[in-house]
Design a protein with these regions (language model features):
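Cytosolic, long alpha-helical scaffolding segments
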Residues: 1-225
Length: 225
């Protein structure tokens, strides 16, 4: 118990230190400085796009790293790795709030017509970022609970199935991140098709797990996770 309390305190302090460092870095961010100083509507819009793109790239990088970390830790019954991923999710939620506040302040510097025309896309981007972080948390939570309670691990077949689809998802996230970093969305239809294919694979895996439950050929707790 003492060790767990110590770990919780360490994680909290570490998160706060990282959060303060990120905020200090944002204060020194040249894009944000220019955003808040400019009075030219066109320039403000261009800078807001740049800032939003930079922030969404960071969110995609977070998602890529922590999705892989969560699944790998679950497959290898690594409780410490899962706790680290969950701590990262809590920290990232704080950064999302800061990102939204900064973006909203920048939006207030645009004229009303531009806000009406472009504002929806900005808020959709924020929702997209929040959903990614929330999804990683929702993925990590049952995995952490499962391992923490020493429930039966995945069998070899299940590990193989989920390892394969995990690699494909991480690779897709990498491609999307690189496209956003370079602001080059040529042939993006290929990534959309790949995402749809992955959704199909996940649906197939879900049906396989339901079949295992019905035939009682595996652990119900494992299949539910």
């Amino acid at each position: 118990i003492i060790a767990l309390i110590g770990l919780a305190i360490f994680t909290l302090i570490r998160s706060q230190v990282m959060y303060k460092k990120r905020k200090a870095k944002e204060k020194g961010n040249e894009t944000i400085k220019q955003l808040m100083q400019s009075n030219n509507n066109t320039e403000i819009l261009d800078l807001l796009r740049k800032h939003t793109r930079e922030e969404l790239v960071k969110i995609l990088e977070f998602t890529e790293e922590n999705f892989e970390r969560t699944v790998t830790a679950f497959l290898h019954e690594n409780l410490r790795g899962l706790r680290r991923a969950m701590g990262s999710v809590k920290f990232e939620k704080q950064l999302i709030k800061q990102m939204k506040r900064t973006g909203t302040l920048a939006m207030c510097r645009l004229d009303n017509n531009t806000v009406l025309e472009k504002g929806l896309y900005f808020y959709q981007g924020n929702d997209f970022a929040s959903e990614l972080v929330y999804s990683i948390g929702r993925l990590c939570e049952p995995c952490l609970e499962h391992i923490d309670n020493n429930f039966k691990p995945l069998d070899t077949i299940q590990k193989g199935e989920f390892s394969d689809v995990t690699e494909d998802i991480v690779y897709l996230l990498q491609i999307c991140r690189h496209k956003m970093e370079n602001n080059d969305y040529e042939d993006f239809e290929n990534e959309l098709r790949k995402a749809n294919d992955l959704n199909g694979q996940l649906s197939h895996l879900k049906r396989e797990e339901l079949q295992r439950i019905q035939t009682q050929s595996g652990s119900i707790k494992v299949s539910m996770v």
